[in-house]
Amino acid sequence: MNSSSIQRKILVTSALPYANGPIHLGHVLEGIQTDIWVRFQKAIGNECYFFCADDTHGTPVMLAARKEKITPEQLIERVGQEHYTDLTSFGINYDNYDSTHSKANQEISKDIYLKLKEKGHISKRSIEQAYCEKDRMFLPDRFIKGTCPNCNSKNQYGDNCEVCGATYNPKDLIDSHCTLCGTPPVVKNSDHIFFKLGNFHKKTEQSNVDFDLQSWIETSEAVSESEGVKKKLKEWFDAGLQDWDISRDGPYFGFEIPSEKNKYFYVWLDAPVGYMASSKNFFEKNFPNEPNKFDSFWKDKNSEIVHFIGKDILYFHTLFWPAMLEGSGYRSPSKIHVHGFIGVNGEKMSKSRGTFIKAKTFAKFLDAEHLRFYLAAKLGPGMDDIDLSFDDFVNKVNADLVGNLINSVSRVSTTILDTLDRTLGTVSEEGLALLEEILTQPVKTGTRDDSIQNIIKTAYEQRNYAKVMREITRLGDRVNRYVNDNAPWKLIKENPEKAREIVTAVLNASRFLAIYLYPVVPKISEQIYKLLNLKGSPEFKDLDKSRILEKTKINPYEMITKRVDEKAIKVMLEENKQSEHPKKEEIPKSSNKEEGIEISIEELSKVELRVGEIVEAKPVEGADKLVNVKVDLGELGIKNVFAGIKIAYQPENLKGLKVVVVANLKPRKMKFGISEAMLLASGEGESLSLFVPHKDAKPGDRLK
């Protein structure tokens, strides 16, 4: 972490949500990750701004508006409001949330293009494209379907086959058709405009600029944190950087390219420029007397520009975007932080499986601060995917947030404090020792000791939020032990002033923990501040013994947050599923199987159900439905199981999952090996769901 006391100037962005769909938990993950970092920077006194916008251009937006019989402008205005409402409901606090369909964005996009053209970074050439004569438009690859030329799978997109993975030219599709009207497309030539990306790679013959992308990536710290990112970038450099098609033919919703007829900027040119436009609109409105405010970030490398993105848009942000900026007189980003995807209950987000969770539905039934807390506990600095396991979510929030960090506040803020006229006393030597543990306790970090405060600050800076949460939770445990050891509910009867000392120490400790927690759960931290009769938002400069509260009045206690209600999760998941798949009337299936056969308790007792933990999972070659798992059953050892669950679970997501196992099943010889047990599951097809034990079950535990 930069330990300098000089205030840093930081401009932060998160990726732009596309205006053709609802906000889902993937968007929320990135928004929360970015917001935590921004709140931390502001809380330690840096000048930091957070910008985003709706990504509004492209064929899908144009066609969606046409389908609704409204203009694209009407569509993006409505969707933009919906997106902003959904994202901010999770406490994501933008300094400005804009739209890429703005005058500022058009002006900056035009300026960048003309400067690139002037410096020889733009070329034009004719290309072949699919054209629908009925709709009178050139078709993007995703608006063409047909039979794969490689494996003959039907209903595949124009650029790649989802069955065999082959990539191809749209004209190679068999029996191709326009997805809008079903008409077979024809091939037409069209002049397209290209950005000569190879000019910014010195290993290519045409390179003629000072800025070299590969050198920038290898020598700067912009994208150096993840081995996965560096490996992927090396692959792209080794393959050679190709010219990038930055134009689209009309009809197209976007900005027209200067001096070109019926040509529009491809959405990926003006989308990242939206970061700049959002900041420009904000600075002009809020700093009217500082006309150079925009340039002080986008042209001055003494400031910092930090992008948070998902790993699926790495190519655009690490290659095209910095080259466009440097080639047009602006500066390249300081940092590009890349995160992974979010899964739900061990699966990828999927509409068909009901795991594609919309932000609006989640926030309707569950506390958004709880999700912030949970995601922070899972997020590290790399681009690993994370999983939202709702069982783990319940346990983590109820135990670590409510049962630990909030519990220490509520235990001393109700009846005990009422008896003490809701007034703090002074902090005893023992209480001061507790506060020093929270503020300055030395902790071993590698070969040296560092204070707990610096460790937490450094972890925030490095986006290692999981480490932040571990340290804060550990401190919360310490405060609760202090409460237990001193039992103020007993002291209040024998020695009220001693009880007042205990309460004073605990509430000061809670105040300091609220400061540490503020970037993660701002509302909860502000509620603790309100309880303590403190004005404003928590700031890290108050993490000091000189800020201890003594002999002050404390406000009446109000509920800070509730435990997670598991019923609310079930209702949320069901409503989310129904919104994606409206319930259809089902025709009852006839069945020859006997149902409702009764068995005796003696027969049931023969079945040995135990908790197992999957320690290994892999697909079975030649078996589409099977997954080969090894299950740890505690004292019974590890058993080999072939389970027909592949339609619902990807093997790579199963490791570490606790399941219910029929442990005493007679081993069964199968074509692929011996299966020694059975995993319990319910449902069919993609709705199949493994039974997962509740709470802290251990491998080998027997079900009763």
Swiss-Prot record:
Its cofactor is Zn(2+). One of its GO terms (molecular function) is ATP binding. A motif ('KMSKS' region) lies at residues 348-352. CDD domains: Anticodon_Ia_Met (cd07957), MetRS_core (cd00814), tRNA_bind_EcMetRS_like (cd02800). Its main location: cytoplasm. Binds 1 zinc ion per subunit. Homodimer. This is Methionine--tRNA ligase. It comes from Leptospira borgpetersenii serovar Hardjo-bovis (strain JB197). The gene is metG.
